[in-house]
């Protein structure tokens, strides 16, 4: 509705592997069936759809699309199609939680302390460095729960457990312009979670808005929306 208000002739198209089951397909101006994002022909298919339908901008909405679109951004630029995606380097920071922790510490934001899995202290928390949707997460209260399977998982990071009964948990949406400067910060308390996504929340301005603005006013290579979870 906002787009139509400023650009009455504009159209919004969507894509999905199964348009018949995609809610956005029923409200957009058209929905195209596409390959899985990992398919080697995905990019060429998206490029052809853009050319055939005079689409000038691509806005990805799930994190699995970001890397492949960033890797092919020049291809779309050469065809006068703008991809609203951050730089490849910053996406690598976000997609690998080992890099994410270093990024936050560099900007003066504390992260959970790492724990040596060979000499653990309890309780602890383990999660994959490339995980999403709250999969393969482990809250471990004692040595008996620290199984061999968990210890031998090469993707798991081990860290101190942050108790949600003690600390409030927030999801913060931040929007960055083409100048890599933040334009909007919206913190929401995570009251109820489903599959890693906030299902019920409460928007609160302070104290996070100023705290994050002071530390993340500018992020090199960051364009569009990012999402941060903090306690």
Walk through the language-model features, giving the residues of each.
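ATP-grasp fold ATP-binding core
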Residues: 104, 111-116, 120-139, 154-165, ...
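Glycine-/Pro-rich loop/turn segments that contact NAD(P) or position catalytic residues
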Residues: 77, 81, 88-113
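Conserved residues at the C-terminal ends of beta-strands
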Residues: 34, 61, 117, 188, ...
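Phosphate-binding site of ATP-dependent enzymes
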Residues: 141-222, 231
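ATP-binding N-terminal substructure of ATP-dependent carboxylate-amine bond-forming enzymes
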Residues: 1-84
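Short loop/helix-cap segments at secondary-structure boundaries that form the rim of catalytic
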Residues: 20-28, 117-122, 148-152
């Amino acid at each position: 509705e906002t787009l139509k208000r400023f650009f009455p002739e504009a159209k919004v198209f969507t894509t999905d592997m199964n348009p018949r089951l995609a809610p956005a397909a029923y409200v957009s101006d058209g929905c195209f069936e596409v390959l899985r994002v990992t398919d080697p022909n995905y990019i060429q298919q998206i490029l052809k759809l853009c050319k055939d339908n005079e689409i000038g901008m691509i806005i990805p909405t799930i994190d699995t699309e970001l890397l492949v679109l960033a890797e092919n951004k020049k291809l779309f630029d050469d065809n006068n199609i703008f991809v609203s995606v951050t730089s490849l380097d910053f996406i690598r920071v976000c997609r690998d939680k080992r890099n994410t922790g270093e990024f936050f510490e560099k900007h003066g934001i504390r992260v959970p302390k790492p724990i040596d899995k060979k000499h653990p202290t309890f309780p602890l928390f383990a999660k994959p460095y490339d995980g999403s949707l709250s999969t393969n997460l482990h809250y471990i209260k004692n040595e008996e729960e620290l199984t061999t399977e968990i210890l031998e998982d090469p993707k798991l990071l081990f860290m101190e457990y942050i108790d949600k009964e003690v600390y409030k948990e927030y999801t913060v949406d931040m929007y960055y312009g083409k100048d890599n400067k933040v334009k909007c910060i919206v913190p929401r308390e995570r009251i109820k979670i489903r599959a890693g996504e906030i299902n019920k929340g409460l928007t609160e301005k302070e104290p996070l808005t100023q705290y994050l603005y002071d530390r993340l006013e500018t992020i090199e290579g960051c364009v569009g929306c990012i999402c941060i979870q903090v306690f």
